Amino acid sequence: MMTDSAPPEPIHAEIPEGWLHKAKTLSEALPYMRRFAGLTIVIKYGGHAMGDPELAKTFARDVVLLKQVGMNPVVVHGGGPQIGRMLDTLRIQSTFIDGLRVTDAATVDVVEMVLAGSINKAIVTEINQAGGCAVGLSGKDGRLIQARKMVRKRHDPESNIERVLDLGFVGEPVVIDPHVLIQFRDSDIIPVIAPIGIGEAGETFNINADTAAGALAAQMKAARLLMLTDVKGVLDKDKQLIQELSVDRARLLKQEGTISGGMIPKVETCIDAVERGVEAAVIVDGRVPHAVLLEIFTPRGAGTLIRASR
């Protein structure tokens, strides 16, 4: 006697396709989790990624994930637009030389207040809200970033004299003392650092966030320095993304003029960090959601990777 039997149920009938895709993505990330477990990832955080509320939340979750899977993320943040708005509110005029904010005594107090106060604590709060345990620091804490006054010179073609430009309390790192950060390596703590340096006599110095991140990454021999920016990365002459560069190739592109404008100091920071022991530095498009995870956990990445010449 024949009986009708119900057709077999399709495999995964009750599992949404999106979940299967997420599971596959997690599985593919496993080799990268092993590769970077226990290693330091320094992230320079700024630009659109920091100014957009949704991207800020995404960034915080991504940093927490890095810590949860065994990496040691260190966040160094900027805050130029926020500083500018506060100076405008206080009616303190800003002047720039070669893209650097001239920082007098009144301005440096505002810079420290905005960077080490409001911005730093906002990032810490965002990371903690995402389930992490972030602690805010400035370069003054534990004498983490010891700095000196930056000296800039400019040649005057009319007089043929090289003039020294006074940038005020704009500094450059001379010593990075990472002992405070080393204490956090084997803990759940994620350090978030404002780029404020301390001088030999206790002065406060305003330090470019890219420069501070590069110096910290070099001192800690980080596996990666990620520089979040508002561009795709380094572009070739046809405006196409260059996914990877050697230090030598990066220097050549700079000489040829392919790397120009605001990209020059970022590439120079990456080159300096790599030559001082960072395994690779990456200029990452911070406008892309989950750009940090894409860079660490996928073969293609999310920007331009610069590594030592072979």
From Swiss-Prot:
Pfam families assigned: AA_kinase
Highest rank taxon of the organism: Bacteria
SUPFAM superfamilies found in the cross-reference section: Carbamate kinase-like
Role description: Catalyzes the ATP-dependent phosphorylation of N-acetyl-L-glutamate.
Sites marked Transition state stabilizer: 44, 266
Cellular localisation: Cytoplasm
Name by which UniProt lists this protein: Acetylglutamate kinase
Record carries keyword Amino-acid biosynthesis: yes
Residues forming coiled coils: none
Pathway where this protein functions: Amino-acid biosynthesis; L-arginine biosynthesis; N(2)-acetyl-L-ornithine from L-glutamate: step 2/4
Enzyme class: transferase
EC number: 2.7.2.8
Record organism: Rhodospirillum rubrum (strain ATCC 11170 / ATH 1.1.1 / DSM 467 / LMG 4362 / NCIMB 8255 / S1)
GO cellular component terms, semicolon-separated: cytoplasm
InterPro entries: AceGlu_kinase-like_sf, AcgluKinase_fam, ArgB, Asp/Glu/Uridylate_kinase, Glu/AcGlu_kinase, NAGK-C
Listed transmembrane segments: none
Residues holding substrate: 79-80, 101, 206
Keyword Transferase: yes
The entry's keywords: Amino-acid biosynthesis, Arginine biosynthesis, ATP-binding, Cytoplasm, Kinase, Nucleotide-binding, Transferase
GO biological process: arginine biosynthetic process via ornithine; L-arginine biosynthetic process
Gene giving rise to this polypeptide: argB
Protein family according to the UniProt entry: Belongs to the acetylglutamate kinase family. ArgB subfamily.
MF-aspect GO terms: acetylglutamate kinase activity; ATP binding
Family annotation (HAMAP family): ArgB (MF_00082)
Catalytic activity: N-acetyl-L-glutamate + ATP = N-acetyl-L-glutamyl 5-phosphate + ADP
